[in-house]
Amino acid sequence: MTSINRRDLLAAGAAGGLAAYAPGALAQGRTVNLKFGNAGNPQTISNRFNVKLWEEVAKRTNNGIKVEIFAGTLGGEQRLLEGMALGTIDVYNGAYTGTREFDIFYSPGFFRDGAHAKRVIQGPIGARASEVLEKRYQARLLGIGRLGPWVLSTKKKISSLDEIRGMKLRAPQIEGMVEALKHLGANPTPIAFNEIYLALQNGTVDGFVSALNPSVAGKFFEVSKYVLSNPFGEGLDKEAISTRAWRRLSDSQQRVVLQTFEELEATEYFQAGINAITTDLNTWRQANGADSVVTIDQQDIVRRMEPLNKRLADEVYGPGTWDTIRSL
């Protein structure tokens, strides 16, 4: 994939701004049609949530907002996010942002759990990350979908993190996860989500790191036998809308979108992700045998990762940030 440079993004954003509607300028009763993109297939929690979200938004706005869902058909996350600035899609959902402010959140052990992540992101740290996202991509953050745990999967069985040293492991192009794998002695290999299956199948990598639920939906267990049951980071999907599309909505429509996301995220995203863990791991066992789901010492993961997490937090957000995060 050819990367889009910042000049292209800014130019596209400026052009889009000239054509955008001012807030509330839409004629009463007119339907705003939007395109949504996510790299996973329709069976993932992320995409099932978005079907429910936008159906509910349509009801609450009397069909004033209608969103067409494109799940796993428009490319990887980087292409989708950049596509928002270019106008090819209007709403993006995914892990990737290419911003340090969000990307360091993906290092294993950075958050204790999804509830802790929400407390941090709802405060000043999350507000700063959102501002960076808006400036870079001309996009407004609608909310964070807590997807549940990320996991580490390997073709070869491991019993501790020492054994991933030297392994080529697929990682998203996300700093927190790339740095984490380096920190543990592995060789991170950035590969788009929609290319993971083939990379495992043809031997490009020895395993991968990704969110558990989309990995099961993508049947990655067919090409990577073992998976750690331990959380290896938190899945935090950004739901963002282009500022161009956001301006097409009236003030009341904007409030409906934000309120509906907040209401549904707790049950249809966060709790759904927690509920799916047992089912997803059982699917892995059924495909590869009872010993294919491996559990290691979780506190060992946290201890190993703390020096890196402290460095990243204090480097990106300023001295003392890691202590603040731990106190929340």
Regions from the PLM with identified roles:
Residues A117-A127:
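A gly/proline- and charged-residue-enriched helix-loop-helix capping module
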